[in-house]
Amino acid sequence: SSSEDKVTVNFINRDGETLTTKGKVGDSLLDVVVENNLDIDGFGACEGTLACSTCHLIFEQHIYEKLEAITDEENDMLDLAYGLTDRSRLGCQICLTKAMDNMTVRVPDAVSDARESIDMGMNSSKIE
């Protein structure tokens, strides 16, 4: 495929390290993480079936405003995510567009899997 069908995405991982990768327009951010084997711990546990909240990402404001409207299903799942912000979405629901080229998304410090009641985040009670 030609390079113009790809966009660059920067993921700021939990440890603050930036992972820069490319994804195909139309792929979800979960696809991008999986296909590029990005080392984001626990990301995408349910493989995009909207059964967990591990692909929770925090977007830049100007990107967030252009995202597709959120569905009730995604909203319900986001409610279960730790460190929820007003710019949070689930990566499995967000598909790449050319407008997202070179965007930066942040992986929240704590991850919760809605399928488990186990507290995986060390500081989940702290609100940023």
Swiss-Prot record:
Residues 7-111 form the 2Fe-2S ferredoxin-type domain. PROSITE patterns: 2FE2S_FER_2, ADX. Its main location: mitochondrion. The modification N6-succinyllysine is found at residues 6, 98. GO terms for cellular component: mitochondrial matrix. One of its GO terms (biological process) is hormone biosynthetic process. InterPro entries: 2Fe-2S_ferredoxin-like_sf, 2Fe-2S_ferredoxin-type, Adrenodoxin-like, Adrenodoxin_Fe-S_BS, Beta-grasp_dom_sf. It comes from the Eukaryota. The modification N6-acetyllysine is found at residue 6. Keywords: 2Fe-2S, Acetylation, Cholesterol metabolism, Electron transport, Iron, Iron-sulfur, Lipid metabolism, Metal-binding, Mitochondrion, Phosphoprotein, Steroid metabolism, Steroidogenesis, Sterol metabolism, Transport. It is found in: Mitochondrion matrix. [2Fe-2S] cluster binds at residues 46, 52, 55, 92. Its cofactor is [2Fe-2S] cluster. One of its GO terms (molecular function) is metal ion binding. Transmembrane segments: none annotated. SUPFAM superfamilies: 2Fe-2S ferredoxin-like. Essential for the synthesis of various steroid hormones. Participates in the reduction of mitochondrial cytochrome P450 for steroidogenesis. Transfers electrons from adrenodoxin reductase to CYP11A1, a cytochrome P450 that catalyzes cholesterol side-chain cleavage. Does not form a ternary complex with adrenodoxin reductase and CYP11A1 but shuttles between the two enzymes to transfer electrons. Interacts with CYP11A1. Belongs to the adrenodoxin/putidaredoxin family. This is Adrenodoxin. It comes from Ovis aries. The gene is FDX1.
